[in-house]
Amino acid sequence: MAIKDWHEDDRPREKLLKFGAAHLSDAEILAIFLRTGTQSQSAIDLARHLIEQFGSLAELLAAPQETVLACHGIGPAKYAQILASLEIGRRYLDSQLKTGQGLGRSQMVKDYISTHLRGEPREVFAVLCLDNALNLINFEILFTGGISSCSVCIKHVLRHALSHATSQLIIAHNHPHTDATPSTADNLLTYELKKACDLIDLSLIDHVIVGRNETLSYAENCLAPFG
């Protein structure tokens, strides 16, 4: 049965407007962006199939272009719609953080970093430079490594921070193929960078790790040296 023939309260767009986004499943949200399905599938059926195929909505959004385009029912137009939905979220978070409306909220910081780092096929290391009011001055990926490690130069991180006249910073990196549990090397880097920042009156306020399916904040979890 086509979605237009469903009861009004069950149609994704009408359901969204009447009850709010919290009442929609991932498949229903995705179906709104897909707009149409195929000859044999409704937009919701197609959305469910994609999420099942990739394992989660997050995995779908992080998948390489060629992998998504190889899926039945997904052409360039639908893929562009999926990318646009992700970019809308990124730009919203970016605007919030640049006006100081989000950096005091741990979840928004994690969401912002996650939208930028999840999907990177290799391990990368990024720095968020902030002013005293926690407005975002700059976000940049400074180092790119391999599939399971990334070399970081602490002196380069400090030079980068000073070049943006920042007083506070957050560091972040990803685990492309594992969960967000910090490794011994992650903990050592965090400690050494915190010590180096303290010497030049820079405040390192968090280290965020983006795993395959979750994001971890050192500060939120009171992990050393923030605990």
Curated annotation (Swiss-Prot):
<dbReference type="Pfam" id="PF20582">
    <property type="entry name" value="UPF0758_N"/>
</dbReference>
<feature type="binding site">
    <location>
        <position position="175"/>
    </location>
    <ligand>
        <name>Zn(2+)</name>
    </ligand>
</feature>
<dbReference type="GO" id="GO:0046872">
    <property type="term" value="F:metal ion binding"/>
</dbReference>
<feature type="binding site">
    <location>
        <position position="186"/>
    </location>
    <ligand>
        <name>Zn(2+)</name>
    </ligand>
</feature>
<protein>
    <recommendedName>
        <fullName>UPF0758 protein Psyc_1834</fullName>
    </recommendedName>
</protein>
<dbReference type="GO" id="GO:0008237">
    <property type="term" value="F:metallopeptidase activity"/>
</dbReference>
<dbReference type="InterPro" id="IPR001405">
    <property type="entry name" value="UPF0758"/>
</dbReference>
<dbReference type="InterPro" id="IPR037518">
    <property type="entry name" value="MPN"/>
</dbReference>
<comment type="similarity">
    <text>Belongs to the UPF0758 family.</text>
</comment>
<dbReference type="GO" id="GO:0006508">
    <property type="term" value="P:proteolysis"/>
</dbReference>
<feature type="short sequence motif" description="JAMM motif">
    <location>
        <begin position="173"/>
        <end position="186"/>
    </location>
</feature>
<keyword id="KW-0378">Hydrolase</keyword>
<dbReference type="InterPro" id="IPR010994">
    <property type="entry name" value="RuvA_2-like"/>
</dbReference>
<dbReference type="InterPro" id="IPR046778">
    <property type="entry name" value="UPF0758_N"/>
</dbReference>
<feature type="domain" description="MPN">
    <location>
        <begin position="102"/>
        <end position="224"/>
    </location>
</feature>
<keyword id="KW-0482">Metalloprotease</keyword>
<keyword id="KW-0645">Protease</keyword>
<feature type="binding site">
    <location>
        <position position="173"/>
    </location>
    <ligand>
        <name>Zn(2+)</name>
    </ligand>
</feature>
<dbReference type="Pfam" id="PF04002">
    <property type="entry name" value="RadC"/>
</dbReference>
<dbReference type="InterPro" id="IPR025657">
    <property type="entry name" value="RadC_JAB"/>
</dbReference>
<keyword id="KW-0479">Metal-binding</keyword>
<keyword id="KW-0862">Zinc</keyword>
